[in-house]
Amino acid sequence: AHPDDAEIGAGGLMAKYAAAGLRVGVVDLTQAEMSSNGTPEIRQAESERASSVLGLAVRVNLGLPDRTFARERLVRAIRELRPRVVLAPHWDDRHPDHVACSRITEEAVFSAKLRRYLPDVEPFEVGRLYFYFINGWAHPDIAVDVTDVYEIKRRALRCYESQFTPPGTDGRYVATPLNTGYLDFVETRDRSVGRLISAEYAEGFAAKGPVRVERL
């Protein structure tokens, strides 16, 4: 939904896959203009720095008005970028935008393969859709060891200075859930998921329905 969401939930996975030579990208739906701290311009610059740290091949911001999302724009982005795997925020989250983003992404992934929907653009079927955690975490269906790239995730998150800098006496930043211990929460969560698979750090992902594999 917003710049920094993907880094919070899947920064390690993105860094790991980018380092392995896979083409990794992010589509931000909004510029987060309703955020308490920072401006759209600051958030854009921060996301560009984070993308560089992670080694992303592409980052697109659809520029949808914050708190409103458009399925058609996302379907067009999916058909243009043709991703094999799509990640979206988990459907159970305290932030309504994350819930809306989860729903519209699921709808767009489904609609992108329909030849009679937006027939001016060639349809495309996404291989897999998984959901990452932002403000909480249930028991994940999949856990990916990101220990070897965790420092890259930390660096990428620190690029979002406007969101994670604690409020001071100068009034530059106001207190929000993101700048009052949030990064500690993220790291604790990733350690906890890592413990489930005997790793120092791991990121968890959820799936709706069985995950198809050829062999165990």
Where are these regions (language model features)?
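Metal-dependent de-N-acetylase/amidase catalytic core
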Residues: F69-L216
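Active-site rim/loop-helix segments in enzyme catalytic domains that contact anionic ligands
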Residues: A1-L81, A206
